[in-house]
Amino acid sequence: MQKMESDESMHIIDIREDYEVQTGMLKGAEHIPMQTIPDHMHTFRQNEPYYIICAHGVRSEKVTGYLRDHDFEAYNVTGGMAAF
């Protein structure tokens, strides 16, 4: 979480469903629903960190693992949006 609080440019991917993001998103986050991540793999770049967020951190943990399995640098935002 410390890195997320810095001013560094970063890729935050909000994987919540459409109805969930209607309540708000983190500034600068990109919305890619969890089920569509495989369809968006071509948009991810190697050697760049991605911070994956969902409502509570459970779904984002799964997506983080999926991205890591495909050799991407990915981090789960523990606690998800509920932590904010």
Cite the ranges covered by each PLM segment:
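Rhodanese-like catalytic fold shared by cysteine-dependent sulfurtransferases
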Residues: 1-11, 17-49, 58-84
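Short, surface-exposed ligand- or partner-binding patches at beta-edge/loop junctions that are enriched
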Residues: 53
